[in-house]
Amino acid sequence: KLNMYNNDPSVKAKIFFYYGIETGSPETMTDLERLINTAISKKNSNKISVTKSQQIGLTEEEKERSLIVNEILDSNRLNYHFQPIVSAKDGEIYAYEALMRVDINPYIDPPTVIRYAALSERLPDVEYETFINVIDVVEKRSDIFDGTKKVFINSIPGQRIPDEYLNDLKTRIKRLPGTVVIELTEQSELTDEELDRLSKLYSDMGVDTALDDYGTGYSNITNLLRYMPRYVKIDRMLLSEIQNSPQKQHFVKDIISFSHDNNIITLAEGVETSEELKTVIMLGVDLIQGFYTARPSAEIIDSIDAVIRKEILEERMKTT
């Protein structure tokens, strides 16, 4: 096309320019190299995004949404709210889960970001920016994350952070020993080889893992044994109105008993009512997370509502 245009200027030619920008104040050659690698990665991602959107036949509206999501990732505009995870023993905050929010108007929800990032083959960027942004907050809030509180970070199934970012991530996580917990889902369907790779990687980083959404889909004890996480998060589906379902109570009790026998900490996820709270405490769960105890917030709180904490303590007393 370019040769044709040189010979005949009337020939129409479409030229694409792909670029990547990363700003910073490098103090060492390593810092400079990281900035360059990030800019190159963004350039390559922009090229992939344009090509991908043409190949899969997106509508004009979808193409526009895809460009917006890529701009969000290029400028790292992913923010996070933190939802407390509380101890079923005393109502104290044990940890926080970091939940994605997007800094853009009009607002785009996280599932939309994930969808278009996947179409543009940029899920590794979401994964890396998530870890880095959350770790930034943790390091800045040393008054909260003083070695006694943990942060749960969701990992996107099947995504591998590029090698040029991985060493930086390892270094930063190792500065927070015993603080980071990485959430995995059964739906990731990891192969034994990939699971072994992740186990070695997380062991090297010094982080624990949590198996998320346990009790959904094809959940079974075999998967729990394959992953052997430090935490298992019992899905909301099993906990909704559990006080009215002997079947759910029996199943959840079995999960808790099996987990405790294998040194796995249990977490009831999505607790929304007082009745659900009382039931999971009666069944012996270790940790509780949900709107009833505390909602996600941009501001990291250091304690839950005193009335809710008192309720937890009173229910706990009944089981001892």
Where is each model-derived feature located?
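Short helix/loop segment flanking the catalytic signature motif in cyclic-nucleotide metabolism enzymes
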Residues: 1
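Short, well-ordered coil/turn segments that N-cap beta-strands
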Residues: 15, 146-151, 175-180, 205-208, ...
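Surface-exposed amphipathic alpha-helices with a cationic face
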Residues: 139, 173-174, 196-206, 253-260, ...
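EAL-family c-di-GMP phosphodiesterase catalytic domain
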Residues: 24-28, 57, 88-92, 102-106, ...
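Catalytic core of bacterial c-di-GMP phosphodiesterases, primarily the EAL and HD-GYP domains
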Residues: 22-24, 123-197, 270
